Structure formats: C-alpha cells, structure tokens
From Swiss-Prot:
Single Gene Ontology MF annotation: metal ion binding
Subcellular location as annotated: Cytoplasm
InterPro entries named among the record's database cross-references: ATP-grasp, ATP_grasp_subdomain_1, D-Ala_lig_Van_CS, D_ala_D_ala, Dala_Dala_lig_C, Dala_Dala_lig_N, PreATP-grasp_dom_sf
Organism listed in the record: Staphylococcus aureus (strain MRSA252)
GO cellular component term of the entry, any: cytosol
Protein name as it appears in the record: D-alanine--D-alanine ligase
C-alpha cells in the first residue's frame, strides 16, 4: 500500500513551545505509520525551521524533538515535497499560541496551497483573540459572563479610570487574561484591587491587549467538536480541579486536575451544551477541530467561556478523551483529522481564481 505523506509541524516562537513539543511526541507515537510516511518540522524558539525525515520509531522523550542542530532551511523548501519525493497530502500543525494557532501559519499554508489539519485563517485568528471571539459569540446570542477589554497603551494613560471601570462593572473575583494566548499562561485570578494591578502587569507581559472577566462559582465543562461543514459534538466532560485555578502548571506539570467523562449533568443540560458548542463552532467559521469551554452554575445556568482552535492534544488531554468516550480512539482521531484536512482542501479547489 502506498503511504500518504504527512508533515507534522511543532515547537514555535511562543510561550507554549514546550506544550507543542509534548503534543508532537504523543501524536508521533500514535499516528498510523503503516498508513502515513511522516516527516517532522521543528520550529525553534528563535523561529528557525528544522526538518527530520521519515519518523518510524517511538519518541521516548521530548528531548528527541528539540532539533536545535542542523541548518535552518527556507520554509518553501521544507514544505515543497516530502522525503519520499512526493507532495505532502497534508500538514498537521501542532502549534499553540501566537504564530501557531492565530491564523498566521494557516495563512502560509494557504499561500503554499498545502492541505492542513485544523482551522483556517479567520477561525484560528478569531478563536485566538478572546475579545473578537466574545464579540462573535455575542452576535450569535450565546450567553457569556460580563467582561471588559483594553490595550496596554490605554492602561498606561488611563490606569485610574480603567481600574474604576473594573470595580464598577465587575465583582471580585475576576480573571485577567492576555487576549491572545492559551494554556492559561499569563492568566491571574484576582480577589481585590491589589491583586488586580499585579494581574494586569503579568498579563501585559504577554500581549498588548487583555480581557478581564467576571468570576463565577461554577463547574468547568468542555465539549469537543469535529468536522467541517457538518460538525459533530461529543457529550460534555468536566475539569475536576484540586486547585483554585486551572493554570498552566496544574494543566501540564502537577497532575492536580482530573477529567470526568462524561460529566455528571442532567441530559437536557448536556444536550444544550452540545448544541451551544456547535453554534460556537459555526460562529467562528471553524473547521477540523475545536474544544468549546463552558461554565455551568449550581442552578444549571450555562455561560460559554471560549473556543480553542488547537486544544490540548496529548493522549491524556480532554479533547481526545472526549472522542475516545464516543468510540473514536486517539489514532483514529488523528486519521480523521487528516481526512478532514484533505476534504476541505479538495472543496477549495472548486473555487474559481480567474475570470474567463
């Protein structure tokens, strides 16, 4: 059987660099190597692109994926053809954060006309920018918690007024978030104005724009969505925390988080969550995969928190686990995403790019 040619891209110039490498290790060890000829491209923290061809063995440590040595090649050379000498059937970007899931690298793949897994330019960019995402949800009529947003330059000029606005409009605790970052990096839970100032200072280290959201005493529920024009959603899962806040450290290092799949919710609430996840997917014109995150209060009030265009994708992450609960294994999910990438690219070929 002739193998399909796949290129996995990971690393990246982002604070989520190490998360991306961990994800790549998991995917490389699970992908069907009888079906796919797999090359990898590692993007260093400095932005250099380094390639390794034909991965056939188990990756036992993320250290094996730090391809720091070797010549940094031109991007167009790297993606022109696979090490088998044939064009790539699909590129699988496993990049998190800015320069990875914000539409920038998706734009590169579009220009090079390469099929790629996951969301397109618009959906990736709008899902990454928390303010734009919230505005799209609002337009779609999806319920959200109160929030405000402002720029670093505005805060430097109008700090007193902005702090007053937060105190007038929101109740503590509040969450301060960089607008364009994931994996809970740069996010702070603030219970008073002193903590608020520190949280703002922390968030502005990662982005020029931030969002401050009203805190709520609620369960954190997540739904996985898969597909292109006709997506499907899983039954919800719950993030059960042994910490006050589900931050980067508790997500990836401490093991203080457990996933309950499916979540213990009334069936009508679960159905509402599935439908809202599909609405959120459509609101940002997504394709491939999305994880929709919600808050559910004790009296079953539902608020959408965000969509994640490149959700955590290790074997133990919520997104693959939700699909595993639906009967789709991790290796099968990887194959399905590659098929969806090819399907979307084939559909794009129906477009006309010149007028006769």
């Amino acid at each position: 059987m002739t193998k399909e040619n796949i290129c996995i891209v990971f690393g990246g110039k982002s604070a989520e660099h190490e998360v991306s490498i961990l994800t790549a290790q998991n995917v490389l060890n699970a992908i069907d190597k009888d079906k796919y000829h797999v090359d990898i491209i590692y993007i260093t923290n400095d932005g250099d692109w380094r390639k390794q061809n034909n991965i056939t063995t188990e990756i036992k440590s993320t250290d094996e994926l730090h391809l720091e040595n070797g010549e940094a090649l031109e991007i167009s050379q790297l993606l022109k053809e696979s090490s088998s000498g044939q064009p790539y059937d699909a590129v699988f970007p496993l990049l998190h954060g800015p320069n990875g899931e914000d539409g920038t690298i998706q734009g590169l793949f579009e220009v090079l006309d390469v099929p790629y897994v996951g969301n397109g330019v618009l959906s990736a960019a709008s899902s990454m920018d928390k303010l734009v995402m919230k505005q799209l949800f609002e337009h779609r009529g999806l319920p959200q918690l109160p929030y405000i947003s402002f720029l670093r330059s505005e805060y430097e000029k109008y700090e007193h007024n902005i702090l007053k606005l937060v105190n007038d409009k929101l109740n503590y605790p509040v969450f301060v978030k960089p607008a364009n970052l994931g994996s809970s990096i740069g996010i702070s839970k603030c219970s008073n104005e002193v903590e608020l100032k520190e949280g703002i200072k922390e968030a502005f280290q990662f982005d020029r724009k931030l969002v401050i959201e009203q805190g709520v005493n609620a369960r954190e529920i997540e739904v996985a969505v898969l597909g292109n024009d006709y997506p499907e959603a899983t039954w919800p899962g719950e993030v059960v925390k042994d910490v006050a806040f589900y931050d980067y450290k508790s997500k990836y290092k401490d093991g203080k988080v457990q996933l309950q799949i499916p979540a213990d919710l009334d069936e009508d609430v679960q159905l509402t969550l599935r439908n809202m996840a599909l609405e959120a997917f459509k609101a940002t014109d997504c394709s491939g995969l999305v994880r929709a995150d919600f808050f559910v209060t004790e009296d079953n009030q539902i608020y959408i928190n965000e969509t994640n265009a490149m959700p955590g994708f290790t074997a133990f992450s919520m997104y693959p686990k939700l699909w595993e609960n639906m009967g789709l294994s991790y290796p099968e999910l990887i194959t399905k995403l590659i098929e969806l990438a090819k399907e979307r690219h084939q559909d794009k070929q129906k477009n006309k790019y010149k007028i006769d």
